[in-house]
Amino acid sequence: MNLNATFFAQMVVFFILWWVVAKFIWPPLVKALDERAKKIADGLAAAEKGKAELELANKRVDQAMAEARTEGAQRVADAEKRAQLTADEIKQNAQAEAARIIAQAKAEAEQQVTRAREALRDQVAVLAVKGAEQILKREVNAQVHTDLLNQLKAEL
């Protein structure tokens, strides 16, 4: 191997170039690469965190939907129960009103029957007196007439 001044000069230039690169170019380059690696790592961590948050949010949404369905079903069941109770109450009120109307109609019919019997007794008494009067062909005085009517009413 031939070692001459050119080789030493090239070595000096190489070491000067190496020193300049190591001193001025390499640190910013390493810093830029480190920053880039950090940004990539932060981005991946943020993506993982976002994915976990999305999964958690989906679970919360599913839970909220299940609760809403349960609450909706409960409200429907409560409404149906209230409607059934209201229908039963209306039915009971209608039955009570019907029973009251029937009792009132029976009482009224009984009163009409009683009044009709009284009227019939009065008419029978008058007819009996008229019949007796025609048979006897005479007029009965007022006191005897009243006594006869009362006696006929009592007998009928």
Curated annotation (Swiss-Prot):
PANTHER family: ATP SYNTHASE SUBUNIT B, ATP SYNTHASE SUBUNIT B', CHLOROPLASTIC. One of its GO terms (molecular function) is proton-transporting ATP synthase activity, rotational mechanism. It is found in: Cell inner membrane. F-type ATPases have 2 components, F(1) - the catalytic core - and F(0) - the membrane proton channel. F(1) has five subunits: alpha(3), beta(3), gamma(1), delta(1), epsilon(1). F(0) has three main subunits: a(1), b(2) and c(10-14). The alpha and beta chains form an alternating ring which encloses part of the gamma chain. F(1) is attached to F(0) by a central stalk formed by the gamma and epsilon chains, while a peripheral stalk is formed by the delta and b chains. F(1)F(0) ATP synthase produces ATP from ADP in the presence of a proton or sodium gradient. F-type ATPases consist of two structural domains, F(1) containing the extramembraneous catalytic core and F(0) containing the membrane proton channel, linked together by a central stalk and a peripheral stalk. During catalysis, ATP synthesis in the catalytic domain of F(1) is coupled via a rotary mechanism of the central stalk subunits to proton translocation. It is a single-pass membrane protein. Belongs to the ATPase B chain family. One of its GO terms (cellular component) is proton-transporting ATP synthase complex. It comes from the Bacteria. Keywords: ATP synthesis, Cell inner membrane, Cell membrane, CF(0), Hydrogen ion transport, Ion transport, Membrane, Transmembrane, Transmembrane helix, Transport. This is ATP synthase subunit b. Its main location: membrane. The chain crosses the membrane at residues 7-27.
